[in-house]
């Protein structure tokens, strides 16, 4: 039920466009659903910037990882949970927590479906081969292959 035949290279190209939009000052526009996450490479020590969709819930930033624990940015966080984040024009440092509990991930997916029914419904259908309105049981099954990252801000800049 997970992402069976998704074009991850195309996703990287889209992420590059989001990076450019932030760079040229359009962060406040794309920042409604996209943030820039900076992690430290677990092997290289280099800083890596990844544009990701997010949900703000009770002052924390929630990021879904469709590739689960295989996503490089998630693996970097597992090695070093200190991250930098840019949301719109705001920059802050935070501590990231990787969550693999299917119940918590399913809760997050329900929030996303409620807030963005068309976009997330389309992703459920095209990426995960589910209906646009999956059941709780389907979300919990999908959640077994995914990960959730929760970032709690430390200091705003």
Model regions: which residues?
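N-terminal short leaders/motifs
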Residues: 1-14, 36-43, 94-107
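Alpha-helical membrane-targeting segments
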Residues: 1-34, 118-141
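Short beta-strand segments
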Residues: 32-66
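A broad, low-specificity signal marking well-ordered, structured residues that form hydrophobic/aromatic
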Residues: 35, 52, 61, 83, ...
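Short strand-connecting beta-turns/loops that link adjacent beta-strands
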Residues: 57-59, 90, 156
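Short, structured beta-strand-loop surface elements
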Residues: 68-148, 154
